[in-house]
Amino acid sequence: LLDDGHRPEMKKLAEEYGVRYLSRATNEHAKAGNLNYGLENSHGDFICIFDADHCPQQNFITNTIGYFADKNVAFVQTPQDFYNLDSFQHRQGKNNKGLWSEQSLFFRVIQRGKDYWNAAFFCGSCAIVRRSSLESIGGFATGTLTEDLHTSIRLHKKGYRSIYMQQSMAYGIAPSNVEPFLSQRVRWGQGAMQVWKKEGILTGKGLTIAQRLNYLASVLTYFDGWQKGLFYLAPAIVLTTGIMPIEAINI
């Protein structure tokens, strides 16, 4: 249990369950620094990573470890699913059928496509990583707000493979209201820009053309806000000007 909060109650909880508790003297490099501290104070060949709110299923390791038979596989990422289905980012499907999360498109469609091009990236939780691969790039990447994306691109530059496994193996807590939701997305956007600048997605060495395009697409999604702005303004423009965005042509 890596605790950057230095909480006595967490230490006590870890002791009750026979879990090793680690807490740093400083919080340098935030989550990436905390993960690297855990890396330095452990010796396992593979590292399973879960955010504090994620609960893995008992068969997580047995279902993911087989991919590492390929010595070039650096990490296996699984979907990030949630058990608080009344969260801010969950919505009921059409005609009240099914339930989808704001992240469903990414984990059900986009990551699968990225996996085809060996460009699926580590998402910071619900994943298992090979220690030797991490050590070859100096551990979890620091210096940006998104250590997961940053670490992924460094591993891919080294020529390692990534695997995206579609089966849900862990469940966490999604943001319950708009404030933490926006804070999380702003952090992701800022981190993506930092990674772009530091790693040179288009110019840096080591990535295939397909990987460059996949990483570029992930970064450029944070420039899509203006499209939603126009979408929200469209009804007001139609009502005040009478100009329809689409004109039907009868033949």
Regions found by a protein language model. Give the residues of each.
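Catalytic donor-sugar/metal-binding loop of nucleotide-sugar-dependent glycosyltransferases
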Residues: 143, 152-170
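Cofactor-binding loop segments of dinucleotide-utilizing enzymes, especially the Rossmann-like FAD-
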Residues: 4, 78, 167
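Alpha-helical bilayer-embedded segments of polytopic membrane proteins, i.e.
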Residues: 210-251
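A conserved acidic beta->alpha catalytic loop
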Residues: 3-10, 26-27
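Long helical/loop segments within the catalytic core of UDP-sugar-dependent glycosyltransferases
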Residues: 15-18, 22-46, 58-145, 156-157, ...
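Active-site donor/metal-binding and catalytic loop motifs
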Residues: 166-180
